[in-house]
Amino acid sequence: PARGPIVAAYGQETAKGVSAKGISIKTRSEAQVVSPFDGTVIFAGPFRGYGNIIIIEHGEHYMSLLAGLNSIDCEVGQMLLAGEPIGQMPKSAEAKLYVELREDSRPIDPEAWFAK
């Protein structure tokens, strides 16, 4: 969904002492974020402590959640193709995109899917 190194792995212990349900990717400042797979946007906007997030339903019980965006360039109900631009990261040297992949609402390790 964005270029950059993974700086926090799935299952890695967070600062709060819990296992991460997704991965964090360090991106360049103002990097473009794209849809990881084909799907339909089911949520796009600010959410609790996550800032701007996008949730995409991919079918067959899979969905992805992307958080940490500065701006969102898609809307609820929009159908997306893999690689289609959906948002932009903040203007910051420390920009990090948080990505979760879920199957039947359970988090799964997204790294193997993104390597395909």
For every predicted segment, state its role.
Residues 1-48, 108-116:
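Extracytoplasmic/periplasmic cell wall- or extracellular glycan-interacting regions that localize
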Residues 20-21, 68-69, 85, 96:
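Short beta-alpha junctions and helix-cap segments that line functional grooves
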Residues 23-26, 53-58, 98-101:
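Short, acidic/hydrophobic/Gly-rich beta-strand patch recurrent on exposed beta strands
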Residues 26-27, 66, 71-74:
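Short alpha-helix capping/helix-loop boundary micro-motifs
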Residues 29-31, 60-61, 94:
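Periplasm/extracytoplasmic soluble domains of Gram-negative envelope assemblies
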Residues 32-35, 73, 79:
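Residue-level "contact hotspot" at macromolecular interaction interfaces
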Residues 35-70:
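Zn2+-dependent peptidoglycan hydrolase active-site motif and core
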Residues 76-116:
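Conserved, short, structured surface segments that act as functional micro-motifs
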